[in-house]
A protein has these predicted regions:
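Extracellular adhesion/carbohydrate-binding repeat motifs centered on closely spaced tryptophans
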Residues: 2-195
């Protein structure tokens, strides 16, 4: 009887150890499965981002790059996205990264705010202040060539969008552009050294 009881006790301990090991293995495999479902996944042509097995919705920042996933469906946004405020954002069509700074899309240049990603219009100065470009309020594209406002003031922008300042030759003629505002002068101009 003592031997049977001892065998039962050993069997119970063995069974307990096996169940503990199985439980640990199950828990480890669950953690592994969750880790495996962290990242971008494409399902039926739609891209999602999962964190620990759950869909992420709204803004996502990875490696200092911003993405936006639809707040209802979790689908990664790509291409142009219009804002109710007017300006638009653009998310790379391949990987969904939000554009910032000056970017070329469909053969045209746009400027996207560094923080918000919204398209900017009007005069935009480079970070070092040396270059000024103009982006059209009607479609946010970069201006090239002559630009005239309602007051009759004129500016000129090179093919790379840089606003002319100082004395410049355009075609056969020389023009003088205010070094601060870029506005083309008319009539005689005293530049300090010569007229």
């Amino acid at each position: 009887m003592g031997k049977v009881c001892k065998k039962s006790w050993i069997a119970a301990i063995f069974l307990g150890v096996m169940l503990f090991a199985a439980g640990f293995a199950f828990q480890a495999s669950t953690v592994d499965a969750q880790a495996a479902t962290t990242g971008f996944r494409t399902v039926k042509g739609k891209t999602y981002y999962y964190k620990n097995g759950k869909k992420v919705k709204g803004w996502l920042t990875l490696n200092r790059k911003k993405y936006f996933l639809n707040t209802r469906t979790g689908v990664l946004l790509k291409g142009w996205q219009r804002s109710s405020r007017g300006p638009k954002r653009y998310f790379n069509k391949k990987n969904g990264v939000m554009y910032t700074g000056m970017k070329k899309i469909g053969g045209k240049y746009y400027y996207f705010d560094i923080k918000t990603g919204y398209t900017k219009s009007g005069f935009v100065r480079s970070a070092n202040g040396a270059v000024v470009r103009y982006f059209q309020p009607s479609n946010y594209t970069m201006a090239k060539g002559w630009l005239k406002n309602a007051k009759g003031q004129k500016w000129y922008f090179a093919s790379d969008g840089k606003m002319y300042m100082g004395l410049k030759k355009i075609g056969k003629y020389y023009y003088y552009f205010n070094p601060s505002t870029g506005i083309a002068a008319s009539g005689y101009v005293n530049t300090g050294n010569e007229t």
